[in-house]
Amino acid sequence: GKTYRAYECDNALPFGYTYDSYIPREKYEKMSVIEKQQALLQGVVLDESSLPETVLTLNDREVPFKIITGKGCQEKDGKLIVTKENAQARLVFDGLDESEIYLITEGVNYEVLSPRAMISDKKWKNMSIYEQNQVFHENSRWRYWKESQKAYIDVTGKFLNKTISIYTDKYNAYSGKHNFLCNAGYSRMGKNSLTLTFQNTGVYSYDDLKVVCQPVTKVDKQVKKLGEESLQDVKVEDHELTGKISVSKPKALVIALPYSTGFTAYVDGKKTDIKQANTMYMALNLAH
């Protein structure tokens, strides 16, 4: 059977936590996915607010890497050509200490190799005319029976085993997804390699492939600040959620419930507007 690991988060945010500054949603939407997760620990994302705008500190870093291909895998012109099932390629790099590592791919596509493309030029030259003609015959009709529908890439490393699922527009569950982010985990001493295992033969093309390190040294302090003035005595009963909170200055209280127009909020008995915060949650303005 499979082996699973369960991890306890030491930095879980409370159910209701507060920000003293905000990030305009228009600005947030233009950030990269790595920048967004950093931003959410520093300011609340709102369409507009009377709070001061957050001065962001971003410290992610893209690191250069080298691709080392194994047997049955070849790198050529921004593509990885795989002629053997479960062929591997290693990404070798110098990761940052005390960082999370992310493998980010954009514009990923997959195409099945034809029978001729599966044979190396060296092997082809040693084949008889009869054998070559058999391959040509298979080559003329292979597209009618083997469409490029789906492929899987396993991403592995120390304490890491994840799979990227690629679906093409020929697959009945195709969703248009061609960009992927794989969290390769935290490394105290700087991770230095990731291994890609290609379950399927074929051509794996991509517009961009990068390794990004995200130092986490500031996370403890940022999470602590968000939870310093948080919602207390939280109760849920009779379709109602209540709690108590005091703030030292004007803040936005974010409640970890999906945003919905069906809710009504009251602060100190007065009806208060509910704002959509951090793209998915609800927020209330709190005055000092």
Tell where the protein language model's regions lie, with residue ranges.
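A short, charged
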Residues: 34-59
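Aromatic/acidic, Gly/Pro-rich catalytic loop(s) in extracytoplasmic/lumenal soluble domains
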Residues: 1-35
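Active-site-proximal, structured, solvent-exposed surfaces of multi-pass membrane proteins
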Residues: 13, 50-288
